[in-house]
Amino acid sequence: MSKGFYKNRRLKSFIFLSACFLVAFIPHANNIENFFYIILTLSFVIVFYGLIVISRNFKRNKVLNTLSRRISNKELPVLDILVAARDEENVIERLVERLLNLDYPTNKLNIYIIDDGSSDKTPLILDRLSRQYEKLKVVSRSPNAGGGKSGALNYALKFTHGEWLLVLDADAELKQDSLIRLFSFVEEGDWSAVQLRKSVTNVSKNFLTSCQSMEMAMDAIFQYGRLSVAGVSELRGNGQLIKKETLLACGSFNEDTVTDDLDLSLRLLLSKSRIGILWDPPVMEEAVENLNALLAQRQRWAEGGLQRFFDYGDQLLTNKIDYLQKFDLTYFFILQYALPIISIFDLVFSIALLLSLIHI
């Protein structure tokens, strides 16, 4: 898409923050009792729909989680694994060796590691491994190529030949039979894309990693529930499988966003391409281990999450998606983005009101 498509992000951000400010301010500027039933109704809807989504996990739908048969090697499609790596000298060799040991026909599997302008020993390690393993293909980009992870993945697309693409992070870990089970799931559900449940490898490192492990499990539970009530499911970057034809039809990976997975999820939704969620096997990754890294990560997620609504909001209001999907998106937009900001404004107004009463 053109740069002009994204030029109104700041204006939309201002409008969004202003709306949150007003929603928090109006009850304080008036008699709050007048808004009691409105707040009560909204709270009931939020809790009720959340309980429905969670409860659906106790009735695991066959198409969501169980497989009636194992797909044969003859039926398996050609798969290209894509990994964008920058300064990953500590994990890249381990990743390559694990990928090469996955159960999958060797004539149907290609591994592409994109060296995205690394300044450490990653290029040297990849050069050595590419001479050692024929299935490994290394694609290199200059440090100033631009586009981030999306740019690296788009650059590698022209070298791929498979029907399906599996995007992994450099710290990803898969079970040996993950690919076989993944395509058995694809065949039964007729999905255009599939997201593997994410799991944490360093869960016992500290309190933060333990919390992230629980968070990932809860996210998968919500994803299951949303999908089972005909809501919206989303990709999560690491461990996302997508049909190459579908990706190209959607315009490839968006290089003008900080969360290409969330952006792509909405574009797939608008094109009526179905995203499945597979609980087992999971894709395992390392959780961030310190608070500064966690805050930076969450800031990026929040920014990218809002960007997609600003970019595609007008299309989401059209008939391209059904009413239940619109409700689901609205619900999680309010829950994840609007309510936290409204709560901050509300807290500020409450403290200001309390201080004013104290000084009277």
Report residues per predicted region:
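Cell-envelope/extracellular polymer assembly enzymes that use nucleotide-activated donors
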Residues: 77-80, 110, 248, 263
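Long helical/loop segments within the catalytic core of UDP-sugar-dependent glycosyltransferases
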Residues: 130, 134-163, 176-258, 295, ...
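N-terminal signal-anchor transmembrane helix
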Residues: 48-108
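Catalytic donor-sugar/metal-binding loop of nucleotide-sugar-dependent glycosyltransferases
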Residues: 265-284
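A conserved acidic beta->alpha catalytic loop
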Residues: 115-124, 143-145
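Basic/Trp-rich segment in TM-proximal cytosolic loops or flexible interdomain/linker regions
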Residues: 1-14, 32, 58-71, 230, ...
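Acidic donor-binding loop at a coil-to-helix junction in glycosyltransferase catalytic cores
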Residues: 258-264
